[in-house]
Amino acid sequence: MATLNQGSLSLLLISCVLGASVSVPASAEDGIIVTGRNVQGFMVGRPSFGKDPYPSTANANPSQQILRATGGELSDNDFAGVSSGSTITRAILPNGDLPGLSNTLGNNSAGLGAGAAAGHASGNSLGGQISGSIERGLAPLNNIGAMMGVQP
């Protein structure tokens, strides 16, 4: 096994410094990020078809409209004026719930499936309906856990 002497170590150090100083810095193009590209197969010995002419891309550069609208950095008032979207339920859905998907069963509360859903949904909101659906869907797993002796 060869040992390194002082001359070879200094030569290695100098070559690393020179290599790092003359390396080309990494640079991106104009902010276009390629998120997906179709790979086109080709036979060995034949030239490739080239890059995908229609790659899936995203443009990271802000457009001139955005730059003009913001006028620079966003302030606290800009963030305070953003709506949470909570009023869209009243604007799109009648009475705030989806017709036909409400949790109220009318006068007959012992209808089909009422035993599985009784008391599990919280109100007439869409969130309550989704929560009730998830609980009904997970009921078989809860039953398996009860058979195994796991207490909820």
UniProtKB/Swiss-Prot annotation:
Q: Does the keyword Chaperone apply?
A: yes
Q: What is known of its domains?
A: Soluble monomeric FapA is predominantly disordered.
Any idea what this protein is called? Answer: Functional amyloid chaperone FapA
- Compartments it resides in: Periplasm
The Swiss-Prot or TrEMBL record describes its family as follows: Belongs to the FapA family.
Tell me the keywords, alphabetical order.
Chaperone, Periplasm, Signal
GO terms for cellular component: periplasmic space
Quaternary structure, from the entry: Monomer in solution. Interacts with FapC but not FapB in vitro.
Whether Hydrolase counts among this entry's keywords is no
Q: Which residues form the signal peptide?
A: 1-28
Q: If researchers knock out this gene, what phenotype do they report? A: Deletion of just fapA in an overexpressing strain yields less dense fibrils around the cells. Deletion of the entire fapA-fapF six-gene locus shows no visible growth phenotype.
The function of this protein is:
An intrinsically disordered chaperone for fibril amyloid FapC that guards against fibrillation, probably within the periplasm. FapA inhibits FapC fibrillation and elongation of FapB fibrils in vitro. Upon overexpression of the endogenous six-gene locus (fapA-fapF) in situ, cells form large clumps during liquid growth, make large amounts of biofilm and produce amyloid fibrils. Expression of the 6 gene operon in E.coli strain BL21(DE3) induces flocculation and biofilm formation with copious extracellular fibrils.
